[in-house]
UniProtKB/Swiss-Prot annotation:
Role noted for this protein: Catalyzes the phosphorylation of guanosine and inosine to GMP and IMP, respectively. Can also use deoxyguanosine and xanthosine, but not adenosine, uridine, cytidine or deoxythymidine. Shows a strong preference for guanosine. dATP can serve as a phosphate donor as well as ATP. Shows weaker activity with UTP and CTP.
Gene Ontology terms for molecular function: ATP binding; guanosine kinase activity; guanosine tetraphosphate binding; inosine kinase activity
Signal peptide positions on this chain: none
Effects seen without this gene: Disruption of the gene causes a considerable amount of guanosine accumulation together with a slight increase in the inosine productivity.
Top-level lineage group: Bacteria
Protein name stated in the entry: Guanosine-inosine kinase
Organism: Escherichia coli (strain K12)
Annotated positions binding ATP: 284-289, 357, 402
């Protein structure tokens, strides 16, 4: 487990030098592992350059997103392959991206649950999915299906306009019996997306998702929900509010989804409102930066050394140096908030907005899992006087999430190819020392 964020001292966590005082508390075997588990609609993003006639011939609407049938998708895919029009085939899916990015950042195990083609041809989209996923992401629990996984075609027309064609394939065929109880029982978090409970009638995915939530509750594993798009939420915000209240501990969203859910256009007020239902909120707000909101134990609150920020809640970041806790673990819960502007003002040229939020969530998951890992290895540490949810303060998690988002915005793919550099030039040292 690599530890999140930067720390000034070189060894802030006793891993290599075994402290004799720790020996008595630690088993002789390998230090206990920590991991996260996520359920996804297994999806491959296929990008191709086509002419306008191609888009018309398949009955697609230029510049829009349409769901297409499996046979149309197969014909379309075969034609793209024969004519060599495919420019990129990436593993996609919100949770797949998040698990991959978590494994790259933490250099540790994540587990992905979902479906995968039983027969995989070399060079096919399913093969690409496996190739583009970190080797630290455990794919051993995927359920085999007889047919295609999900495919999202991005067809770039002559004018550069993007048209999307989505073929769900068998991606929603995950059955409840394919959810491994022991894997969820030992996890630091269960990560889900709102798309999982919104499927066609008769598809087993929602039932599998609820089964996973049931296991998570049984073993006190925090459930993390990332909101899909504002349209899914806007259909029935009250239903989602109740769903969050009943099942979810950590919520990740962008400012549009936040407004659809809460009716508040200010991301800070929306995050505050969401604390009525969940324990911790991560809200990315594009060029404004990102917000976090959570609870801490009043007795253990820590004042910020950063300038106090104005906002809809005055001086809202006053206690941003506090670590987050779940509401039920607090004796006297206090709401705490933090905000950070985009790292280095954001990239000069944004290559890709798809996945910046998944990157930020992966950073938060890394911090939460590092906390579980530290607690199981150094249980009597003063860092665990209270039952904290995060290893670092809200302000520090914001910095880390922000840095990872920047990395994703700066590249073509939503998946990181390597972890963050140990030391950086540029503004780095002054940035982390702030």
């Amino acid at each position: 487990m690599k530890f999140p964020g930067k720390r000034k001292s070189k060894h802030y966590f006793p891993v290599n030098a075994r402290d004799p005082l720790l020996q008595q508390f630690q088993p002789e075997n390998e230090t206990s592992a920590a991991w996260v588990v996520g359920i996804d609609q297994t999806l491959v993003d296929i990008e191709a350059k086509v002419d306008d006639e191609f888009i018309e011939r398949y009955g697609l609407s230029a510049g829009h997103s349409l769901v297409i049938e499996d046979d149309v998708a197969e014909a379309l895919y075969q034609e793209l392959k024969q004519k060599n029009l495919i420019t990129h085939q990436f593993a996609g899916g919100t949770i797949g991206n998040t698990m991959h990015n978590y494994s790259v950042l933490a250099d540790d195990r994540s587990v992905l649950l979902g479906v995968m083609c039983s027969n995989i041809e070399i060079g096919s989209y399913a093969y690409r999915y496996l190739c583009n996923t970190s080797s630290r992401t455990d794919l051993n629990y995927l359920q085999g299906v007889d047919g295609p996984i999900g495919r999202c075609f991005t067809l770039i027309g002559e004018s550069g306009e993007r048209t999307f064609a989505i073929s769900p394939g068998h991606m929603n065929q995950l059955r409840a019996e394919s959810i491994p109880e022991d894997v969820i029982a030992g996890a630091s978090a269960l990560v889900l997306t709102s798309y999982l409970v919104r499927c066609k009638p008769g598809e087993p995915m929602p039932e599998a998702t609820m089964k996973a939530i049931e296991y998570a509750k049984k073993y006190n594993v925090p459930v993390v929900l990332t909101l899909g798009t504002k349209f899914v939420i806007a259909e029935n915000p009250q239903w989602w509010q109740q769903f969050l209240k009943d099942h979810v501990s950590i919520l990740a969203m962008n400012e549009d989804e936040a407004e659809a859910l809460t009716g508040e256009s200010d991301p800070l007020l929306a995050s505050d409102k969401a604390l009525d239902w969940v324990d911790l909120v991560l809200c990315t707000a594009g060029p404004i930066g990102l917000y976090m909101a959570g609870f801490t134990e009043d007795e253990a609150k820590r004042k910020t050394q950063h300038p106090l920020l104005p906002g809809a809640i005055a001086e809202f970041n006053q206690y941003e140096f506090s670590r987050a806790m779940r509401h039920k673990d607090c004796q006297n819960p206090l709401r705490v908030y933090s905000h950070i502007a985009p790292y280095m003002g954001g990239p000069e040229k944004i290559m890709n907005t798809n996945g910046a939020g998944d990157g930020a969530l992966a950073a938060l998951l890394h911090d939460i899992t590092a906390n579980s890992y530290h607690r199981s290895n150094v249980p009597n540490s003063s860092k665990h006087k209270f039952t904290w949810l995060t290893y670092s303060s809200l302000a520090q998690v914001c910095k880390y999430a922000n840095r990872v988002s920047y990395q994703v915005l700066n590249q073509h793919s939503p998946r990181l190819t390597r972890g963050l550099p140990e030391r950086e030039d540029s503004l780095e040292e002054s940035y982390w020392d702030r």
